[in-house]
Amino acid sequence: IETLAYQWTRKPCKTLRPRKNVIIRLCSIECCFAHSLEGCDSKPNKDFVRDIQGWAKMADRLWIWNYCTSFAHYYTPFPTLRTLDDNIRFFVRHNVKGIFEQDNYQSPNGDLSSLGGYMMAKFLWDPSYDENRAMNEFIEGVYGPAGTFIRQYVDLLHDKVAKDNIHMQIWIGPNVPFLTDEIVAKA
């Protein structure tokens, strides 16, 4: 039996405890994904960390429904590749037994979703897998000599988000603060 711990039902129960055959699927829909769930200073992320800690103490079967794209506009860059490994390790440390990473399924080429899918597969198989190794394997294998430019593009966006401490939830559109005229010209 599975139940969603989602939005208004996300907080751990105060008095009830799920039976051993009940899966609690905790959803991160309100979170900022530009930073690791655990390392972000936003209130939604702090609340999510508190909630996963609470559920981890009481649920034998804690699963995650995590988000990896902008659902408002699939072609809008969603620079979260540097958080994927940290988040998966965070889930593992908190007794999570199943992870569903919802990405861009309706537009298979939006925002380098194949790269993100490859990296998530590597981290789900081995949470200690190196982020740069996973990224470079895919970029070099798929793009060959052009991979250098793809990696520069990925780093350009991720560096801008990190430098300016930009927060991103899953409903961002093309008017995001990290897509400045300067960044778009460089991209």
Locations of regions flagged by a protein language model:
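Catalytic-core regions of glycoside hydrolase
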Residues: 1-136, 141, 181-186
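Long, charge-rich alpha-helical interaction segments
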Residues: 107-108, 113, 121-126, 137-179
